[in-house]
């Protein structure tokens, strides 16, 4: 593996996996970030962090330089789920600030691609698709849907399909 993601729930003061009030400059007590990052580095694996967009918006000026210091490879920013003018500007501010700190970006819960990655090549991908994670709660992601993506969504650029969504196999 080239990269690994530390998904939702790692940041301090979070009250749940979709918490928008956590402190993304600190971890919960159960997460020893220096130890995780050292182990990943020993295996030649770079680490990404999941962020709720509201936390990124509130703390990016403080957090992104910290992540660069930690050696974080990239950020998976989630739950924007809209494409109004303010949010489009937010995307631009994030990728610009991330580029300044050598961070890759994956916008999850994102609107359709708009060419921003041409200006900011650190914008690796964005979701904008009904991906594999939906198999945890829906039957809509099926072989026909997956084939269709190559001829529809992928024409607009790379996508975050979220491969590897796990579910409770005892159901």
Label every PLM stretch briefly.
Residues 5-171:
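Aromatic- and carboxylate-enriched substrate-binding clefts and catalytic-loop regions
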């Amino acid at each position: 593996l080239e990269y690994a993601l530390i998904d939702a729930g790692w940041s301090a003061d979070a009250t749940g996996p979709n918490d928008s009030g956590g402190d993304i400059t600190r971890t919960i007590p159960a997460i020893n970030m220096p130890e995780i990052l050292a182990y990943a580095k020993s295996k030649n694996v770079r680490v990404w962090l999941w962020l709720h967009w509201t936390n990124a918006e509130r703390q990016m000026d403080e957090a992104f330089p910290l992540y660069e210091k930690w050696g974080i490879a990239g950020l998976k920013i989630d739950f924007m789920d809209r494409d109004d003018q303010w949010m489009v500007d937010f995307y631009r501010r994030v990728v610009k600030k991330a580029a300044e700190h050598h961070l890759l970006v994956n916008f999850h819960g994102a609107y359709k691609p708009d060419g921003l990655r041409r200006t900011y090549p650190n914008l690796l991908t964005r979701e904008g698709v009904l991906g594999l994670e939906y198999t945890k709660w829906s039957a809509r992601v099926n072989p026909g849907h997956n084939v269709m993506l190559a001829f529809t969504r992928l024409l607009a650029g790379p996508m975050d399909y979220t491969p590897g969504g796990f579910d409770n196999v005892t159901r």
